[in-house]
Amino acid sequence: PSDLTNRRLLYAVYLHEQTGLPLLLSGGAPGAAERSEAEAMAEILRRFAIEPGWVESNSRNTWENALFSVEYLQRSGIDQVLLVSDAWHLPRAVYSFEQQGMDVIPAPTGFESRCGCSLYYWIPGSWSFFLSSFAIREYLGLLAYHWGQAEP
């Protein structure tokens, strides 16, 4: 899994240990990968003797993560979730799950910030542009959802 996925997984495991709630792992195979993100996460958990409650490995985007995951949850009588994702991705993820009828408690991780007060921090750099691309994608995704379109 990617570093982003690992960060989310680590926080999900922390919350699982604190609450005893079951874990639903969601994520399809990125690009031409043979194994889905959800299957890769499940393998990591099993190495540490943690069995996921559900593994949803068919989704291709955030909307499908919600759509397919909610099917598993509703079959088990679950209508409220702690939703773990990066802070910058949570608004779109929460919206997607709420549109599927879930009561969502956001559980953000992966906050990106740099502190500093010098003038140097006001000069744009390549890392800032890279992070901005995430924000732009999320805002475009939310707009697309509100206009009834799929992922941009």
Predicted segments with their positions:
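A transmembrane-helix-recognition feature enriched in membrane-embedded lipid enzymes
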Residues: L131-P152
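A structural signal for short, hydrophobic/glycine-enriched beta-strand patches
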Residues: P1-F129
